[in-house]
């Protein structure tokens, strides 16, 4: 079958296929209405999670229309849809092939622990296998005879072939006097479940070798601040490495190319490096590759590390095998001047699925075939957005002379001169923005605003930039944003009298801080799931998370004592008197990362002080804006608020 036909089949599904009950935007009276860019970008992606089977013969993907979602499978050389399944009213997080005939889907829900267990509301993951051949769905149930367990997954699945059977390995929870981590296995086709290993330490991870045995176990003791790696020797788990770390703990991430060493990821001088640890004698080898890595790429069947990525904004892929690197270089040549990200690949690396973003192909999924050296666009991620707004790399000097890199999205068809501006700081704060496609700045640009996304100090672009953020929460991390406004105004790119700040999570905090701690820059603010009271947030974190999590936050906030007055110094709620512009707060009722009360108390305090404030509650929404309806609700409320207080035209 020609690759063009494959693309047209996917396009037909995206436009509305009468399969699986006819998931389509079309109503009973005719064709689907024409949607605005805001409506398109506020919805979940039309096409996502495009993955190729290990043998390279089948494609699976998720198609969305409104809140209706379905997983489809099509096969090379055959017409129509091989099979498909509707996704129920749940949050589908990911799909992946576990062998040539079975897909593993990860779903989540926000809830309290099961009856009889104590703990806060959290996002619980569960896994479901979709048997493509039999068209049946099998939930992975962690039910062990004579052992109480919770039916949740606590990490990513690993898949191995053992005695010609597919075995899925998933970390989960078992119960003694409390819930504790364990490693479970599920053997197909009967889904027989076993509890392979138990741990009495909450922070535990495992590595599974090619034969399906536990090869290594990592543990971290939070109160003692000690870590240990154990490997299997002569049928027993033996300690081969240990150390201390108060925050930057190591991780075991896979195996070396020959399987003789465990690969551990370490933070050294702020950089992440990969070190091989011999399972034979516990000796450390020279770091893999050159430089530091971001993302690990493993061989599906063995867990051996075959490559990784360098860089944050400009992500570069490195493969340790020359032939694989040649395949990847061919992919890059097929998409010159475009951003290319690896999504999925066949085991022999002959067929590769990528996301591409650029002027020629917009934001799309594509298939590259090594044997034909042909690339085919499979479909747009957001159907109807074929020409996204242009993203420019910019940089400026902060007040203390530090160079800050940022990205400026400019409304399509407008000259970069005297534009209204939205400053959109990222969450984290140890995260980073890039010139990749992002639905939020694209949505704001579609309304006529330029959008500035600075990688302020604390962003994880470089180790030096991360460390520069320690102790600067609400301080230089905040003025790095307004320094960008001043620089663009000096150049004449934006109108300094028409600037607002918008953000979510830490970015939501930055939005509130921008109009309280750094007043006079912004004429309005939109805070989505933002932190308003740092002392209350710190107390909540202490009650609901491990000490290492608290130490992580304290390092950025510059806090060494929970009674430190610095918490009030950088809390927006304690500086409402300085606020003289309107604020919109938006918060998901099911948020388990930043409590909903953080917005409630800020709204109440602002109302009491007579400050202009609006509040939008997103019912049944979590911290990540996971559903299309509430994401659109947030965008529409924000757009109306911005238009009223900082009109673009």
Name every feature range the model reports, one short phrase each.
Residues 26-352, 359-361:
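Beta-propeller folds
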Residues 205-207, 317-413, 439-442, 446-447, ...:
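Non-catalytic accessory segments flanking enzyme active sites
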Residues 11-21:
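Bacterial N-terminal signal peptides
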Residues 385-497, 504-505, 539:
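Cap/lid segment of the alpha/beta-hydrolase catalytic domain
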Residues 357, 424-428, 588:
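Glycine-rich His-Gly loop
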Residues 2-11:
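Bacterial N-terminal signal peptides that target proteins for export
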Residues 456-649:
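Active-site-proximal cap/loop segments of hydrolase catalytic domains
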Residues 52, 61, 97, 255, ...:
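Conserved hydrophobic/aromatic "anchor" residues
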């Amino acid at each position: 079958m020609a690759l063009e036909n494959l693309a047209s089949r996917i396009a037909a599904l995206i436009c509305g296929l009468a399969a699986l009950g006819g998931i389509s935007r079309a109503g009973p009276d005719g064709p689907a209405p024409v949607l605005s860019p805001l409506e398109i970008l506020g919805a979940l992606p039309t096409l996502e999670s495009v993955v190729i089977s290990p043998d390279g013969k089948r494609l699976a993907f998720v198609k969305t229309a409104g809140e209706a979602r379905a997983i489809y499978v099509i096969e090379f050389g055959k017409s129509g849809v091989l099979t498909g399944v509707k996704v129920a009213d749940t949050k589908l997080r990911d799909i992946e092939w576990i062998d040539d005939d079975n897909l593993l889907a990860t779903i989540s829900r926000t809830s309290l622990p099961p009856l009889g267990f104590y703990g806060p509301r959290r996002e619980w993951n569960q896994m479901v296998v979709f048997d493509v051949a039999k068209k049946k769905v099998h939930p992975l149930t962690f039910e062990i005879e004579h052992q109480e367990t919770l039916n949740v997954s606590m990490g990513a699945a690993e898949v191995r072939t053992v005695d010609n059977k597919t075995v899925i390995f998933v970390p989960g929870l078992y119960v003694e006097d409390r819930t504790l981590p364990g490693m479970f296995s599920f053997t197909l086709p009967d889904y027989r479940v076993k509890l392979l290993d138990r741990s009495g330490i909450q922070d535990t991870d495992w590595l599974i070798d090619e034969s399906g045995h536990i090869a290594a176990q990592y543990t971290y003791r939070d109160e003692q601040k000690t870590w240990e790696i154990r490997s299997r020797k002569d049928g027993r788990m033996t300690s081969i490495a240990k150390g201390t770390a108060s925050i930057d703990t190591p991780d075991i991430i896979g195996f070396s190319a020959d399987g003789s060493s465990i690969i551990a990821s370490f933070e050294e001088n702020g950089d992440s490096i990969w070190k091989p640890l011999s399972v034979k004698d516990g000796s450390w080898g020279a770091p893999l590759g050159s430089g530091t890595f971001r993302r690990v790429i493993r061989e599906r069947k063995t867990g051996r590390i075959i490559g990784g990525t360098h860089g944050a904004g400009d992500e570069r892929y490195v493969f340790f095998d020359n032939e694989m690197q040649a395949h990847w270089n061919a992919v890059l040549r097929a998409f010159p001047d475009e951003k290319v990200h690896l999504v999925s690949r066949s085991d022999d690396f002959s067929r590769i699925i990528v996301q591409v973003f650029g002027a020629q192909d917009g934001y799309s999924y594509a298939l590259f075939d090594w044997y034909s050296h042909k690339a085919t666009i499979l479909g747009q991620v957001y159907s109807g957005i074929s020409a996204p707004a242009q993203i420019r790399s910019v940089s400026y000097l902060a007040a203390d002379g530090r160079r800050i890199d940022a990205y400026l999205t400019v409304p399509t068809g407008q000259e970069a001169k005297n534009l209204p501006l939205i400053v959109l700081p990222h969450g984290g704060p140890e995260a980073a923005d890039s010139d990749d496609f992002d639905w939020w700045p694209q949505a704001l640009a579609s309304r006529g605003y330029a959008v500035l996304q600075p990688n302020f100090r604390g962003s994880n672009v470089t180790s030096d930039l991360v460390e520069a953020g320690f102790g600067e929460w609400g301080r230089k991390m905040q003025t790095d944003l307004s320094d960008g406004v001043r620089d663009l105004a000096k150049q004449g790119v934006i109108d300094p009298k028409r600037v607002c700040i918008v953000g979510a999570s830490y970015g939501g905090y930055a939005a509130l801080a921008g109009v309280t701690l750094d007043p006079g820059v912004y004429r309005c603010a939109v805070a989505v799931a933002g932190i308003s009271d740092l002392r209350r947030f710190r107390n909540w974190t202490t009650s609901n998370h491990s000490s290492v999590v608290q130490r992580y936050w304290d390092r950025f906030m510059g806090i060494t004592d929970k009674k430190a007055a610095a918490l009030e110094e950088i809390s927006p709620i304690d500086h409402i008197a300085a606020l003289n512009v309107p604020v919109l707060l938006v918060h998901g009722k099911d948020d388990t990362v930043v409590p909903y009360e953080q917005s409630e108390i800020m709204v109440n305090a602002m109302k009491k002080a007579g400050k202009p404030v609006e509040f939008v509650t997103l019912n049944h929404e979590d911290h990540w804006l996971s559903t299309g309806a509430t994401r659109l609700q947030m965008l529409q409320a924000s757009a109306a608020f911005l238009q009223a207080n900082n009109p673009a035209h």
